[in-house]
Amino acid sequence: IVEFRANGLAGDPNNIQPGSLILVPGGKKVVPVAPPPVRPGATDIPPASESGWTWPALGLLTSPFGPAHPLGIDVAAPVGTPIYAANSGQVTFVGGNPCCSYGYHVIIDHGNGYETLYAHMSTFAVESGAWVNAGDVIGYIGLTGRTTGPHVHFELRRNGVYQDPLNYLP
C-alpha cells in the first residue's frame, strides 16, 4: 500500500494522515453507506433552470468543466448527500465497479440526444428502466471508484459530445 503509486505516499508510511483515502491494490470490499432518512416534506431539491435542468447535488463545485476536466464537473458534499436527476428521463444504467473509474454510477437518457452520468455513488435509489423527474433522488454521494474525496462526478452529453454542464444548470 505504501509503495502503491496512486496513494502518493512516496514509500513512507509516515505520509499517511488521519482521514487519508488509501487505495488497496486488488481490493474489492466496499462498505455501503446507509442513506440519510428522508424528512417528510423536505424541500432540499436544487432549483431548476428555465430549460428544466437542475444541479445533481447540493454542494461545492470543486472541478469545473474545461481542459483539465473535459468530461464533466465535480460537486463535493458529504457521503450520503442525495444525488438528484438533473432532468427528467429514463434510467438506462445502474451499476459499476466500486474499485475502478466511475465506481457505482447511474446514466439517464433525457431524450433529444441528451444523456447524463452521475459517478462515485455509495448507494442507488433507482433501478435501470425507471422513469425519473428532474430533482428525483437517484442515489447518494460516496467514495467508490477513483476519487480523492466524497463528491458526485456529473457528465452531460448531447449526441455523444461532452457538454459543459454549467451552460445548462441554473
Where are these regions (language model features)?
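LysM (lysin motif) carbohydrate-binding repeats in extracellular/periplasmic proteins that recognize
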Residues: 1-20, 100-102
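Short histidine-centered loop motifs in beta-beta connectors
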Residues: 7-9, 78, 94, 111-135, ...
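Short, glycine-/polar-rich solvent-exposed loops and beta-turns at beta-strand/coil boundaries
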Residues: 9-17, 67-68, 145-148
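Surface-exposed, glycine-biased beta-strand/turn segments
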Residues: 17-103, 134, 163
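Residue-level recognition of beta-strand microenvironments
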Residues: 64, 94-95, 124, 141-144
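Zn2+-dependent peptidoglycan hydrolase active-site motif and core
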Residues: 86-125, 150-155
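Short glycine/proline-centered loop/turn elements that form peptide/ligand docking sites
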Residues: 101, 125-128, 137, 143-148
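Short, exposed beta-strand-loop hairpins at the edges of beta-sheets
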Residues: 143-146, 154-158
